[in-house]
């Protein structure tokens, strides 16, 4: 069956679950392809080089690293203590402030670009949209994106089915609902989002793939013994598909960008 949205306490538990695994998250989560940054520049109507970019929900700095490499002047905003500590350890050259998108600790009209990589769904758009508009300069842009599983790839669809049965959810339906939520990222209708999808893949050892899975919030709040058993079963399934121990992960990055009205 399809899971209902988590109640507030469960949502909060999932949102805060990453701090304890920040180093594992940084080491194993996928990054994003250069084509995504190209699309952000195109839809934002300006180059990243020289842009004042605020990366909200920056986590361990996966997106901040890419923005900085493109020449953006990046300020990271991260609510979690563990994630912020890992960010500062790995990226001491990029400033970070503690905070969240519902109440940005920033002055008005100070950013050319605000980004949320894999993070907008942890905010309340009734608060985070006005906050983004407050902080963005005229002609600024808000860019939101998510790595999503390419469920048209057979082995990925099969793995999603197994994970869904373990967690008691329909992952394919949840991913479709996520797409709908992206289209409704601003319930107030103040922003006009343009949508783009970028497909990419990476080839990683099975251990990296499993460690990545283990950093997802639904598993992080599952009892450790159950999660460990599930991951061992997954290892066996994956070795049947990838006998050399190298997994070809395929992602569709779902990107939406809106310029300030």
Specify the residue positions occupied by each region the protein language model found.
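Conserved class I S-adenosyl-L-methionine
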Residues: 1-49, 83
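Conserved Class I S-adenosyl-L-methionine
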Residues: 180-261
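Nucleotide donor/acceptor-binding cores
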Residues: 50-51, 109
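A structural alpha-helix within SAM-dependent methyltransferase catalytic domains
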Residues: 41, 65-68, 129, 133
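Class I SAM-dependent methyltransferase SAM/SAH-binding core
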Residues: 52-54, 59-103
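A short SAM/SAH-binding and catalytic strip from SAM-dependent methyltransferases
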Residues: 112-126
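Conserved catalytic/acceptor-binding region of the Class I
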Residues: 127-203
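A short acidic, Gly/Pro-enriched loop at the edge of an enzyme's catalytic core
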Residues: 102-114
């Amino acid at each position: 069956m399809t899971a209902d949205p988590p109640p507030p306490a469960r949502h909060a538990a999932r949102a805060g679950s990453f701090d304890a695994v920040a180093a594992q998250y940084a080491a194993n989560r996928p990054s994003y392809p250069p084509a995504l940054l190209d699309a952000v520049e195109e839809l934002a109507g300006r180059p990243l080089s020289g842009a004042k970019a605020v990366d909200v929900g920056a986590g361990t700095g996966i997106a901040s690293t890419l923005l900085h490499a493109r020449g953006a002047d990046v300020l990271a905003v991260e609510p979690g203590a563990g994630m912020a500590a890992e960010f500062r350890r790995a990226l001491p050259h990029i400033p970070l402030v503690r905070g969240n998108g519902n109440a940005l600790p920033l002055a008005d009209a100070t950013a050319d670009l605000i980004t949320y990589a894999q993070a907008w769904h942890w905010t309340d758009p009734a608060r985070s949209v006005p906050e983004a508009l407050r902080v963005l300069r005229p002609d600024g842009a808000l860019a939101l994106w998510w790595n999503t599983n390419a469920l048209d790839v057979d082995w990925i669809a099969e793995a999603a089915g197994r994970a869904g049965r373990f967690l008691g959810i329909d992952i394919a339906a949840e991913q479709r609902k996520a797409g709908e939520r992206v289209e409704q990222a601003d319930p107030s209708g103040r922003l006009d989002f343009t949508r783009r999808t970028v497909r990419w893949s990476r080839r990683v050892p099975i251990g990296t793939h499993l460690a990545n899975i283990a950093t997802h919030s639904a598993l992080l709040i599952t009892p450790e013994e159950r999660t460990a058993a599930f991951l061992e079963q997954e290892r066996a399934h994956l070795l049947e598909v990838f006998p050399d121990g190298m997994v070809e992960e395929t992602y569709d990055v779902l990107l939406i960008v809106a310029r300030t009205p």
